[in-house]
């Protein structure tokens, strides 16, 4: 249909299906690398299979190695105890890590120029770990991040099997990810393992070791020179990002309790949906266009939106807080046959197709019975389209 059929900001369609990388070695920059965590009790070797430069990242030190050597009179061999522990269990994995912590804690702050802040905001704008942060939390994260220039290729930023102390966001350049099935870097050729992905600007890595207090699950190496990373330390990561995730889940659960469609679900079922939702904000006039492939289901958290059909200038349905749309296109595996335009700035909770099919099975029959007043009349007048929002 013509792009001029509906009101709103035509041509802008953030609700459309997300792009998917054709090459598995070059994933979308919005994806975070996820690798299965390995056995914590593996000993961390210090060998690698190619000459990699030193990166002053996790537990870096400028102290000469000789300063750590013990004399013969100590009764210990040289370098005794120099290996890094990889099985650490002292840190709490409470889903709300700040619940019992010192309330006087304040996040670190590193002054940045306006130009640095703009670059950093752009780098994290598409990262899902930061999507649910409020303005105060976002400001804390921006203040705590530290710029880490990576001047040349083949600098090893993190090593599989090591204990992790930092989370990294890529601003510039690319980084290759290697995984060794043994669970850690091994000596000799091929010791890094297999290359499984490349992280590009906007991507991030290192969160798994901090979230689960486990060894690094992969080795990440700069794939080119003149790269730029931003690092966030373990404590700040856990206190801000993990605590905000916990709070976000609680907010979602409260919101889902108010959604009539989900009233028949158990608390456990709603909690699983809450974990899968992603919050997005859009300005007034943003459009989900008729004819798009349906890949997402939306719950309206705040704001107002309207549905339009081809050939009709008047809205056929209005949406407000607690309403939902996008379900029929997923239920019927059909293109969207109506356009939804945000009347005001809106905040929506998005659920992908896989999560929709897996988690909303118990209410499928209710969604199929949903009647869209006014849509049926439009369909009778324009029989070429079905009422699948």
Swiss-Prot record:
Residues 1-57, 87-110 are annotated as: Disordered. Keywords: cAMP, cAMP-binding, Nucleotide-binding, Phosphoprotein, Repeat. Residues 1-128 are annotated as: Dimerization and phosphorylation. 3',5'-cyclic AMP 2 binds at residues 261-377. The keyword Lyase does not apply. It comes from the Eukaryota. The modification Phosphoserine is found at residue 87. GO terms for cellular component: cAMP-dependent protein kinase complex; cytosol; nucleus. 3',5'-cyclic AMP 1 binds at residues 129-258. Pfam families: cNMP_binding. InterPro entries: cAMP-dep_PK_reg_su-like, cAMP_dep_PK_reg_su, cNMP-bd_CS, cNMP-bd_dom, cNMP-bd_dom_sf, RmlC-like_jellyroll. GO terms for molecular function: cAMP binding; cAMP-dependent protein kinase inhibitor activity; protein kinase A catalytic subunit binding. Residues 21-31, 87-105 have a biased composition (Polar residues). Residues 34-43 have a biased composition (Basic and acidic residues). Belongs to the cAMP-dependent kinase regulatory chain family. Tetramer, composed of 2 regulatory (R) and 2 catalytic (C) subunits. In the presence of cAMP it dissociates into 2 active monomeric C subunits and an R dimer. This is cAMP-dependent protein kinase regulatory subunit.
């Amino acid at each position: 249909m013509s792009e001029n059929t509906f009101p709103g900001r035509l041509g802008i369609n953030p609700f459309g299906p997300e792009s998917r990388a054709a090459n598995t070695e070059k994933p979308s920059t919005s994806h975070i690398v996820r690798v299965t965590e390995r056995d914590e009790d593996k000993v961390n070797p210090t060998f690698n299979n190619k000459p990699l430069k030193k990166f002053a990242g996790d537990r870096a030190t400028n102290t000469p190695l000789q300063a750590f050597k013990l004399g013969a009179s100590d009764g210990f061999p040289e370098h005794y105890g120099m290996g890094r522990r990889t099985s650490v269990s002292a840190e709490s994995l409470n889903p709300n890590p700040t619940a019992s912590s010192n309330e006087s804690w304040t996040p670190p702050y590193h002054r940045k120029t306006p130009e640095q802040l703009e670059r950093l905001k752009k780098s994290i704008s598409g990262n899902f770990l930061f999507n649910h942060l409020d303005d105060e939390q976002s400001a804390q994260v921006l203040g705590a991040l530290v710029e880490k220039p990576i001047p040349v290729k083949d600098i090893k930023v993190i090593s599989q099997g090591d204990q992790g102390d930092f989370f990294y966001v890529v601003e510039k350049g690319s980084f290759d990810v290697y995984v060794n099935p043994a669970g850690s870097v091994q000596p000799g050729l091929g010791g890094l393992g297999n290359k499984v992905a490349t992280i590009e600007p906007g991507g991030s890595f290192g969160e798994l070791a901090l979230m689960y207090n486990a060894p690094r699950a992969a080795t990440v190496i700069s794939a080119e020179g003149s790269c730029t990373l931003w690092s966030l330390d373990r404590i700040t990561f856990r206190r801000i990002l993990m605590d905000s995730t916990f709070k976000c889940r609680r907010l979602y659960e409260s919101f889902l309790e108010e959604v009539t469609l989900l009233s028949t679900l158990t608390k456990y079922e709603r909690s699983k949906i809450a974990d899968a939702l992603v919050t997005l904000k859009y300005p007034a006039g943003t459009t989900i266009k008729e004819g798009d492939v349906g890949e997402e289901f939306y719950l309206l958290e705040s704001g107002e939106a309207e549905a339009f059909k081809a050939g009709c200038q008047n809205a056929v349905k209005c949406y407000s807080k607690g309403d939902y749309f996008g379900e029929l296109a997923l239920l019927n595996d059909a293109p969207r046959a109506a356009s939804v335009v945000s009347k005001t700035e809106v905040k929506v909770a998005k659920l992908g197709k896989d999560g929709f099919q897996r988690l909303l099975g118990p209410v499928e029959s209710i969604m199929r019975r949903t009647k869209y007043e006014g849509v049926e009349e439009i369909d009778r007048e324009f029989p070429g389209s079905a009422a699948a929002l």
